[in-house]
Amino acid sequence: PYSKLFIKNLSSKTKIHSSLKIKMPKQLIFKNYSNELFREKYDLIVIALSLSGIDFIGKELKKFKIKSPILILTKGLKYEKNSKTILTLSQQLLKKNNKLNISVLKGPCLAKELARKNQTSVIVANKNIKTAKYIGKIISTKYYLIEFSKDVVGVEINSAIKNIYSMIIGSGQSLNRSSSLFQKSILEMK
């Protein structure tokens, strides 16, 4: 579910991110996936896969007792045909392993904007607010501002539907129309 060449480039001495064209911080450690990875203790495990990769990582996480907090960057919802329910990504992973300490991070946040160190605000949600704040301490900077919530499911659902509203707003013919759609979207999310 990932590019080995991409990880190799990130793991090299130069640590260049091929699509963002930036040098990554030396503190970040990038490793190819193996079962051995989850036997180690980390400050934080970050899951930044495509939506289709969540099933894969869920099956892998099921095999281990993981003590490190996990932060999901991926957005989306999954419809389960058998039970006719919609699951958030945290629910999907917890269904595989209910002992995981899962947090979610949601934007709006474009990687290129963040890489340019443009002011960005996101929210980290975990049912235990202390865990969310612990993660915030690790990842926040003067330009990357973090807010916190205990409502993991609410944050995930709003993040997923935000993209739908964004596309609708972007299709507006004028600023007045776009502003009106934006206001309506915010009211519906409350």
Language model regions located:
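Rossmann-like NAD(P)(H) cofactor-binding subdomain of soluble oxidoreductases
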Residues: 24-117, 135
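Short, charged/polar "capping" segments at the starts of alpha-helices
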Residues: 3-9, 79-82, 132
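Internal alpha-helical scaffold of NAD(P)-dependent oxidoreductase catalytic cores
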Residues: 96-101, 119-190
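Short, basic, helix/turn surface patches
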Residues: 22-30, 174-180
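Cofactor-binding loop segments of dinucleotide-utilizing enzymes, especially the Rossmann-like FAD-
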Residues: 1-2, 75, 127
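NAD(P)-binding Rossmann-fold cofactor-contacting core
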Residues: 1-22
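A general structural signal for well-ordered alpha-helical segments in protein cores
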Residues: 7, 54, 86-90, 132, ...
